[in-house]
Amino acid sequence: MELLSWGEIIIRILMQLMPVWISLVVLFALSILYKRRLGLYGKLFDSTIGMIGFAIVMFWVFAGFYAGALDLILTHDPLSQVSGMKNKVPGTPMRGAEENEYSYFLLGGDTLARDVFSRMIAGSTVVIVIAPLATLFAFMAGITLGLPAGYYGGRLDTALSFAANLILAFPVILLFYLLVTPEIRLTGMPQYMAAVLFAFPLIFCTVLINSRLYIVPQKRNIVLSGVLFVLLMLYISLINEDGSKITLFNAIDLFNVDGGLLTVFVSVVFVNSPTVFRIVRGLAMDIKTRDYVAAAQTRGEGPWYIMLWEILPNARGPLIVDFCLRIGYTTILLGTLGFFGLGLEPESPNWGATINEGRKLLSIYPHPALAPSF
């Protein structure tokens, strides 16, 4: 077999990503067709720039899903090393490829003879798992603390604002260096932080349901029991880790989370939560002076009902924008951490680690570093 030309490489990559293209076409067709019924999401498709940005985001979401969950678009195992493929240029054929094995390294091989294309696509699975979930957890923590701080004010606001400013004043990279050092990880600090931070979704869902259904106690109790049971199972599974300081109810531990992944996840939530807190606090301080809040107070509604069902819905615009932006910031942060070798395993196909490995021979073999950079 001969080396593929760049035209053949591009065509093969486009064909390999066919499930992604089909998903994008279906998503956009349905979204444009029903955009008038989709509220704020539908308005996105009135903007050309908005659609382009959304397409780029959803491309990597679908790529990560099909690569990680369904294993449809990867040409090779992103961790396996293939003899004779070290630093090979894009389009190099594999020697002795089996019948059911893809016969080319579409974007070449890296310094450890691993497929660059497969590692680039597999790296997106790390991003689509950590970035949205970490941002969601950070928002739940920030909202749970920011609403009462802005609504009540006083000493509670002073104490929480001081803690938030203290965290924000700490250098982010230095914080990550501290959390991933073996000595700190042996103390169980990441697990203790996870136990605290992951409790906020439980608190948020509890007060959300209770404030809405408090007038129908029987229905409230049923809904709360079901939701809290599921969340508690997830909570226990997230904070438990083999060999860690925290081992709660190992018999009902549904899944194991890699220690490096948990450290990165907790660190991202910890860094983002204070910023979300400050945004929510400022919005709550502004909105609590509105007439509809005074009307709710006159009706005798409780504080948490007012905060969650009067103030929070009217603050959704800035929060949605910040949520989307923060996912992008988190993606960049994950790449930075991977580049410095913090948290995730060295052989992980995350984009930052791949770029770091490829830069060492950038002048001779640029393709391993350039592919994940784009």
Question: What role is predicted for each listed range?
Answer:
Residues 114-374:
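Alpha-helical transmembrane segments of integral membrane proteins
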Residues 1-139, 143, 147-148, 158, ...:
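Gly/Trp-centered helix-boundary motif
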